[in-house]
C-alpha cells in the first residue's frame, strides 16, 4: 500500500510540474503575441504620422510644377 501511495504522489507531482511548464510556455507565447501586436500598432502610428508630411510634400510639388 505504501508503494502505491508513493507512486501515486510521484505521478501527481510530475503531472503538476508538467502542467506548470505548459502554463508558463502558454503565458510566454501570449506575451510574445501581445508584444507583436504592440509593435504592429506602433508601426502603424508612425506611418500615419507621416501622412501629413507626405501630403504637404505632394501639394508643394503640385504647386511648383503645376
From Swiss-Prot:
The modification Phenylalanine amide is found at residue 65. Residues 23-46 form a propeptide. It is found in: Secreted; Target cell membrane. Its main location: secreted. The keyword Secreted applies. GO terms for cellular component: extracellular region; membrane; other organism cell membrane. Residues 30-41 have a biased composition (Acidic residues). Residues 1-22 form the signal peptide. Optimum pH is <7. Is active against E.coli ATCC25922 at pH 5 (MIC=50 uM), whereas is not active at pH 7 (MIC>200 uM). Expressed by the skin glands. InterPro entries: Frog_antimicrobial_propeptide, FSAP. Antimicrobial peptide with activity against the Gram-positive S.pyogenes (MIC=12.5 uM), but not against all other bacteria tested (both Gram-positive and Gram-negative). Does not show activity against fungi, and against Leishmania species. Belongs to the frog skin active peptide (FSAP) family. Phylloseptin subfamily. This is Phylloseptin-S3.
Amino acid at each position: 500500500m505504501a508503494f502505491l501511495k508513493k507512486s501515486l504522489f510521484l505521478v501527481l507531482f510530475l503531472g503538476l510540474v508538467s502542467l506548470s511548464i505548459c502554463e508558463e510556455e502558454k503565458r510566454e507565447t501570449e506575451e510574445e503575441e501581445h508584444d507583436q501586436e504592440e509593435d504592429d500598432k506602433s508601426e502603424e502610428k508612425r506611418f500615419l504620422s507621416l501622412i501629413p508630411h507626405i501630403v504637404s510634400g505632394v501639394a508643394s510639388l503640385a504647386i511648383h510644377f503645376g
